């Protein structure tokens, strides 16, 4: 990681190209003392850019420590990407920097810090502490995403609870406890974790049971299943043919489509479309209901996802009641 960043104070004043490149934008100044080559930076994914910015900010600071989402990124934990995300830092001694020293792309939080770790030259809190910070600063949904990924790396719920206990009395402690309680070590993706968080928070009129990595049929595994009946399919970001669309298949012949949306089965057939169609048909024939949503739609319109789940379950129950009444 360190070779990607240039420590500006280490460059001699008579360097033949660096200072000119820094002035003309060939090198980007990510932090007061850290620069990165423009082509390298723009070639990274948003997630990698945010991680690099966090490391640059910490390496450019004298005492500040990365916390919350920024710490999670440095440790490789799941964090949902946002172009509006700022680097999150804290100062020792539970203090805040003077206003004239604050950077517009950073957020300083007043919090007690443990002894920091050093990762890629950046001072940061531990992965367990990062999870707790995300839960208390950003809420249950993003906290559960981070907690699930922490458990995947081998951090236990016991370790999370111990770290939480060491912090003493803090705000939003109830949210932290809920995140730890509901976290699991088998979530297949941050989007599956986010969807599960939405389902946990939703006020459903029926009992709801969730299973992660559910084997619905031989050779067909779902990221998330509700009540052993409703399969939640979350298209990955590179599945362009389903991005921005959602469909809910009810029974062998009926498809419920949200207004204005295009379902995967109406798009011109591609090899992946054929696989999805065959998979959905097998699931429907076996009595499952498939709810498909893109990651973008899930994160940008969470209330729509919950509304679709409620509408889907209601429609299925109404169809079953109508069928029974005809018998």
Walk through the language-model features, giving the residues of each.
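Surface segments flanking catalytic/ligand-binding clefts of nucleic-acid enzymes
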Residues: 6-13, 151-327
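Short gly/ser-rich loop at a beta-strand->alpha-helix junction or flexible surface loop bordering the NTP-binding
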Residues: 1-172, 208, 314, 318-327
